[in-house]
Amino acid sequence: MSQAIAEQAATLWGIEPHALQLVARRENTVYRAETPEGPRALRLHRPGYRSLAELVSEMEWMEALTTAGMQVPRPSTSLGGQWIEMVGETPVSVLSWLSGARAGAGGRLDV
């Protein structure tokens, strides 16, 4: 997924495109976005990997966990009031940024 898609997506949340920094290319392509409200994670979801209903369900679940007091990324709605926006065929979401340690080798946390 391209930087151009990320830059176009950023504007849907009122994020300045120059504020994006690529941080991961895995299941999603993730950019860190600096905003006046604090850092955000802009996620470009792989087209066709998950349905729109599945992505919305994920946002609803994270919102419910946040409301219940859990420390999880909180979904941000776009300027159009949506949790998921489409840029062409690419679903996009934005979440609050939670700092933390990277997972160890094999995706395990070394504790």
PLM features: residue spans?
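Generic detector of short alpha-helix boundary/capping microenvironments
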Residues: S2, H18-Q21, G88
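ATP-binding pocket architecture of kinase catalytic cores
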Residues: T35-V111
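Short N-terminal amphipathic alpha-helix/helix-capping patch enriched in small hydrophobics
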Residues: I5, R26-T29, E58
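ATP-binding glycine-rich phosphate-binding loop
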Residues: L12-E34
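A short, low-complexity linker immediately N-terminal to eukaryotic Hanks-type protein kinase catalytic domains
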Residues: S2-E16
